[in-house]
From Swiss-Prot:
This protein's encoding gene: Mapk1
Catalyzed reaction equations: L-seryl-[protein] + ATP = O-phospho-L-seryl-[protein] + ADP + H(+); L-threonyl-[protein] + ATP = O-phospho-L-threonyl-[protein] + ADP + H(+)
Classification lineage: Eukaryota, Metazoa, Chordata, Craniata, Vertebrata
Expression tissues: Highest levels within the nervous system, expressed in different tissues, mostly in muscle, thymus and heart.
One Gene Ontology biological process: response to nicotine
Protein name: Mitogen-activated protein kinase 1
Amino acid sequence: MAAAAAAGPEMVRGQVFDVGPRYTNLSYIGEGAYGMVCSAYDNLNKVRVAIKKISPFEHQTYCQRTLREIKILLRFRHENIIGINDIIRAPTIEQMKDVYIVQDLMETDLYKLLKTQHLSNDHICYFLYQILRGLKYIHSANVLHRDLKPSNLLLNTTCDLKICDFGLARVADPDHDHTGFLTEYVATRWYRAPEIMLNSKGYTKSIDIWSVGCILAEMLSNRPIFPGKHYLDQLNHILGILGSPSQEDLNCIINLKARNYLLSLPHKNKVPWNRLFPNADSKALDLLDKMLTFNPHKRIEVEQALAHPYLEQYYDPSDEPIAEAPFKFDMELDDLPKEKLKELIFEETARFQPGYRS
């Protein structure tokens, strides 16, 4: 062990990866939003793992996302949600420039898979079931993921699926309009529910269901269903398929400017799903219709989606666990300076330090 440690940190593509002596034989996988991901050999458990290097401390937003992700993933425990196996960082806060998060190694993700393969109905059904099974747990903890998209769904060779990237996640709070909530909302536009763009009051779990609907549509056709180039284009893509919203649906849009914009548009008819996806299973299209519903109050919820006939071969409520307790952030992270967030990240990762006692 001492000899390995003395060899110093490994370099990957010009970046220091200081994870020895336990983790060796590093191999580049890709770049994350603010760090590199490598696979490595875990000499303790004798398996290959994924290690994400994060260097967030220069930016308040990156610190926030890192802390959210670590806090949530250390409390969640579910087969369809990526866990954290280990966290490596410097022994003192002054020395801590990077954080290394060790997770199970998953060979690919749904984004990469859909670029190269057309999925069978069986695969679509099984992947969708696992997404919803993981989402049931997330929502039972009163958390919104808020950034569900194909690249955040990790897959391995046995078709196990795990949801990752909780950096944008929030505690669900339907009564509270987060100040600045929209401004920092940077989730990928193509998977955003219409109410996010229309500034409806309070976001609910239904925003994640919309994203899952977009993902299902993409699995059926290997292309994004609403590939908007910008904010208004995104809305036009959605209305071009769903048709013009009814008066009842317009009433849930609080923002008058947004409502008037919708009223000013020429009337559009809904495009039948079987015209868009002529080869798709009719039950899959029925579930898709219930997920991609303009009005968030009429959108299907995760438990109902799991019980839908399309998923009946997998549906088993006794094997679809929920969180033991609702998740809470001790404080609103938005307003904290990066120095305070760094302290909180240091504390949150202490349990992985050698000789730690709680």
